[in-house]
Amino acid sequence: MKVKSWIGGIAISCAMALGAQASTGDHSNDPIVVAAVSPAELQRATHDATRQVQGKSRIWCVPFARLVSGVEIRGNANTWWSQAGSQYPRGHTPITGAVLNFRSSKAMPMGHVAVVSEVVDTRTIKVVQANWTRNRITVDAVIDVSPRNDWSQVRVDNGGSFGRVNPAYGFIYRPAETLASN
């Protein structure tokens, strides 16, 4: 069996997302195998996605995250979590290549999506994202400040200091089994 990539011939490795939950069936609490991406693979996907959005009058988080992660969801970021429920595993454990899905808030009425580029420790990650800083693609540290350590409240590094607390749903994963073919 060959593993196909989610973007541009990039090889994918597999990882267990301990916080992932299956969206259907009787085994909703069983761990599931999801696609993880090496830093080099993510860098290449980010480069490819950046080239595709360059020259556009505006860079948006949704198409950028879709291109980088391979998670094929459309619509505003605040709709991704509910849409993912029928298509993709979701959970509260960051892994490289997963989409961090921010909830709507007063500051972000349409929500936000970013792709995990590095897991630093259990409460710190780095994400690659578009339009956190207007019309730019950036790599930023994100810390989990939720009382239950479930990534439901996060702060994003803004030039050396972590900004406001942002509500988040969690992580949307690319399932490994969708990558396999004969």
Please give the residue ranges for each predicted region:
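N-terminal secretory targeting signals
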Residues: 1-54, 169-182
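Acidic, low-complexity intrinsically disordered regions
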Residues: 2, 56, 76-77, 128, ...
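A residue-identity detector for tryptophan
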Residues: 6, 60, 80-81, 132, ...
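Enriched - but not universal
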Residues: 9, 63, 83-84, 135, ...
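Amphipathic alpha-helical interaction segments
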Residues: 14, 88-89, 140, 159
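Aromatic- and glycine-rich peptidoglycan recognition patches
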Residues: 26, 121-182
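Secreted/periplasmic proteins that engage bacterial cell-wall peptidoglycan
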Residues: 42-118
